[in-house]
């Protein structure tokens, strides 16, 4: 049995989020949350939030045991890019890109495999 959680429109670049995800991929849920707690990246907080949500979905919707949950699949997709204008000298302007990310976490019961 699997449970899934998705956090959409997170204001961080997908590349930065994927660096954090690579650390916790395949870990037990509790160990992954403990690891993310001590990471300084802003993306670690968002990934931890999504993992907690997936674990809560597994417990509430499927009556799965939290101790046996592990991160089966975790990935970050690119969301829409917010485009802003920064005025420059002599009437010119530069475009500022503010990327967003969609974070997806799937947790499964390790005892089933």
From Swiss-Prot:
GO molecular function: rRNA binding; structural constituent of ribosome
Swiss-Prot/TrEMBL keywords: Ribonucleoprotein, Ribosomal protein, RNA-binding, rRNA-binding
CDD domains: Ribosomal_L22
Ribonucleoprotein is among the record's keywords: yes
SUPFAM superfamilies given in the database record: Ribosomal protein L22
Taxonomy, superkingdom: Bacteria
One GO process term, biological-process aspect: translation
Keyword hit for rRNA-binding: yes
Cellular component, GO, one term: cytosolic large ribosomal subunit
Oligomeric form and interacting partners: Part of the 50S ribosomal subunit.
Family, as annotated: Belongs to the universal ribosomal protein uL22 family.
Function, as annotated: This protein binds specifically to 23S rRNA; its binding is stimulated by other ribosomal proteins, e.g. L4, L17, and L20. It is important during the early stages of 50S assembly. It makes multiple contacts with different domains of the 23S rRNA in the assembled 50S subunit and ribosome.
Protein name, per record: Large ribosomal subunit protein uL22
């Amino acid at each position: 049995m699997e449970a899934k959680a998705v956090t959409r429109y997170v204001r961080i670049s997908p590349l930065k989020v994927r660096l954090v995800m690579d650390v916790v991929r395949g870990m037990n849920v509790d160990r992954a949350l403990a690891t993310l707690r001590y990471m300084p990246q802003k993306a670690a907080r968002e990934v931890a939030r999504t993992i907690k949500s997936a674990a809560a979905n597994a417990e509430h919707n499927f009556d799965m045991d939290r101790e046996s949950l592990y991160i089966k699949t975790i990935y970050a997709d690119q969301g829409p890019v917010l485009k802003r204008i920064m005025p420059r000298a002599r009437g010119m302007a530069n475009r500022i890109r503010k990327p967003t990310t969609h974070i997806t976490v799937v947790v499964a019961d390790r005892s089933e495999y």
